[in-house]
Amino acid sequence: MMFRDQVGMLSGWFKGWNECEQTVALLSLLKRVSRTQARFLQICLEHSLVDCTELHILEGEANNPAIINQWQQESKDKVISQLLTHLPLLKPGNIDAKMAYMKLLPKILAHSIEHNQHIEESRQLLSYALIHPATSLDDRSALAMWLNHLEDRTSGNFSTQSRCRSDSLDYGQMQYYHQRQNSDDKQNGWPNSRDSGICISSSGWQEKNTGCENGHLPLYSSSSVPSTINAIGTSTILSGQTHHSSLKRSVSLTPPMNVPNQPLGHGWMSHEDLRARGSQGIPSDHAPLSPQSSVASSGSGGSEHLEEQSTACNTFQDEGSGMKDVPAWLKSLRLHKYAALFSHITYDEMMSLNECHLEAQNVTKGARHKIVISIQKLKERHNLLKTLERDVLEGGNLRVPLQELHQIILTPIKACFPQNSNTEEHDQEADSQPPLLASKNQATESKDSASGGIQQHHIGNCESESGGVPLPESDLPGQFTRVMGKVCTQLLVSRPDEENISSYLQLIDKCLTHDAFTETQKKRLLSWKQQVQKLFRSFPRKSLLDVAGYRQQRKTSVDVLIGSRGFGQSNSLPTAGSVGSGIARRNPRQFQIPSRNLPSTRLSLLGASSLLGATQRASASNPAMLKQGRQNLWFANPGGSNSMPSRSHSSVQRTRSLPVHTSPQTMLMFQQQDFQVPVTEPDINNRLESLCLSMTEHALGDGVDRTSTI
């Protein structure tokens, strides 16, 4: 696809967004430009707004605290309209006006959520507030709680529009997370947000030597930008390979059949400039993937025959046919010139194609062989998903399974509607199961939730798709959802990995807009997305940087001192700290995690009913493996589930094991005072072995427990 085609397609999508979504998308693209480009854009914007007197009047009102305070006497409908118009014009550094906005916003959000009104407008207000350079880190922290309330409100009234529109907050959320963590990504050559000298003011972009009030808006690149923004910013513009499944962010964003022939920016970019890149016309919905418009369609035989078939019935347009993603899949295989050949056949007919059928259609020998091999790989996806499910359960690196899932979701997937309802009934039963340990630890868990922790039932919900009922090979969406549930559990209990979390959220966004997944599956996926997002929000400031530093030092580390709860490691059960002792790190810096003061009985309950996975129980129930289990059943490497086992010189050897339920507070509180525990290594080994035996005995006595989430 030529540059002009890409610009035209992007312009078509841009017109389908509301003003807030357009602003978020542009801001995401602008963070990728250099300083010179940013300065040029600033000049263009300032020049175009010189004679805009109405804007200057609105800007004066937006920065007048007296006028903002008067809005409190107006009706809620009018106040929301005024906020959407004036909040983007707030100048950084105007503390009085900002405080007036911060007093008014919670009242409006509370009214909208309570009466279930103006939900979309509330999302837009939160998006503006979270990415605005005038709001400080504390202001964003105060507003972050409203994200959960909005998500809970939309999840109760689940619909395609509300699900897709909820993504309009993703960029603001991720921007907020990065500012909390002070990430120093320098992929663009810009030092960081505080050194770039770029901030937003009333007249556009201004270059300053000092930052805005809160260090202004960071414009560095990030892997956690929502999938839609990444797809538009990288896949479409840079690589030229489009995957329509990843670009359908909402119903209104589907590109029109005929995109207007005009460049992006109107007067800023002439037609001659665009034509210099090379262009052959404006594409339709799937134009770049068809032999008629593709610049790569010439070369081998059979093209005339394919053109004749292009007017036949197009199965690419049929909902639930499984053929909508075939053009993008063929393009990824460099076989898009044969898209017309697949446009008049069904999904089942495509899966049964062989070289004889293709030869009859005048397909060249090399292309025939490549198509047959690719179809065979499609048939192996179900087994691959089952393998990925086992790999995720065993722990280890989540990056490879996530990459495989990204590849699978881009392939053609047909919706599966089983004739009997056994699977659906099982899924409903799994959803209706009581939360894990809720009756035993409800008070404690609610306290953890109030402080930002993860409740145990979140992990149970992630496994609602992972029942023992085998799925048919044709049910790829069901098997895919099952693996996504396993990955959700690993993310919730493992050490935080920003790249994995971002990749997982992008996967869910693609699934939510995919017509092969049922509404029940999409509800689960949306629930898991909200759980992972809540986990991401609960990370303390600089936590990811601390974890990165901790991983670099893991070869010289033995363990982190653990309080009575004993969940300092993401991939191990309570160690010596759980029995009243700790292990001194060989690193000069020592850390201490304060005790959560849980009763000793709860530790036994956790060890018996939830901390043992199916793999561990199988090992523990085998007498031949019991001795081995005493040595390596519990202790995983300190790098977490997403790092390779550490070859530490410590006397405590760690192997990979299933992670346990934990909370981000106990996982990530590494900024504590120094602490030394005088204890000998033989004493440590004895206590650890005793703890292993105790946990194994509890596990063997709990073999029929069905509340485990693994």
Curated annotation (Swiss-Prot):
Record organism: Xenopus laevis (African clawed frog)
Q: One matching Pfam family, short form?
A: SAM_1
Tell me the InterPro entries matching this sequence: PHAT_dom_sf, SAM, SAM/pointed_sf, SMAUG/VTS1_RNA-bind, Smaug_SAM
SMART domains reported for this sequence: SAM
> Which residue intervals are annotated with compositional bias (Polar residues) in the record?
309-318
PANTHER family xrefs: PROTEIN SMAUG HOMOLOG 1 (PTHR12515:SF8), STERILE ALPHA MOTIF DOMAIN CONTAINING PROTEIN 4-RELATED (PTHR12515)
Residues covered by region (Disordered)? 276-319, 441-476
Q: What family, per the record?
A: Belongs to the SMAUG family.
Q: Per the record, GO CC terms? A: dendrite; P-body; synapse
Cell compartment(s), UniProt: Cytoplasm; Cell projection, Dendrite; Synapse, Synaptosome
- Protein function: Acts as a translational repressor.
Q: What sequence ranges are listed for the domain SAM?
A: 319-379
Keywords in alphabetical order, please: Cell projection, Cytoplasm, Repressor, Synapse, Synaptosome, Translation regulation
Its protein name is: Protein Smaug homolog 1
The GO terms describing molecular function are:
mRNA binding; translation repressor activity
Name the Gene Ontology biological process terms: nuclear-transcribed mRNA poly(A) tail shortening
